Amino acid sequence: MKDKIFSVLQRVGRSFMLPIAILPVAGLLLGIGSSFTNATTIETYGLTSLLGNGTILHALLVIMNKVGSAVFDNLPLIFAVGVAIGMAKKEKEVSALSAVIAYFVMNTAINAMLTITGQILENGEIAESVLEGTITSVCGIQSLQMGVFGGIIVGLGVAALHNRFYRIQLPNALSFFGGTRFAVSYTHLRAHETCADL
């Protein structure tokens, strides 16, 4: 029993390695880009002619800053996909697609529930009674701020469903939806159902 639990925890830990591997590169891009586009830094070191607005180097550093920031802004989605890939036994690419779909479905369903309960108003603004920082924009969808934890939960759930259903055989009339296609469709339905239960 202990060996089985330890084995599963090892697989979960290894599944974190893929998303974590991108963080140092993204951190360097973000750090260098933001440091050398900071107006105070540029003025303090007298680098206005070299790094000031309108220079080619400034444009390159702004791009580096934005590229590094894109990774950190979307860490939950990256972890959802990485964990789903790492935990899937076979057909890992299908698991990755399922994770992306489930992540968007989860956030859209949460947005709908927040709108229904009046925490997000009809004009898209957040109600005054909601604690600041509780609701944030996730890939353009106003949802609860769950961070990387939400992505990990989605990835683990998708991998569990994928490993169970990616080989399923359906009757001939529905055979198009069998196998990996069923895993993707079923994951979508389960993500919606799970969020509706909340």
Language-model segments: residues:
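Early transmembrane hairpin of solute transport permeases
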Residues: 6-177
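Small-residue-rich segments of transmembrane alpha-helices in multi-pass membrane proteins
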Residues: 181-186
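N-terminal low-complexity segments that are often proline-rich with Ser/Thr-Pro
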Residues: 174, 195-198
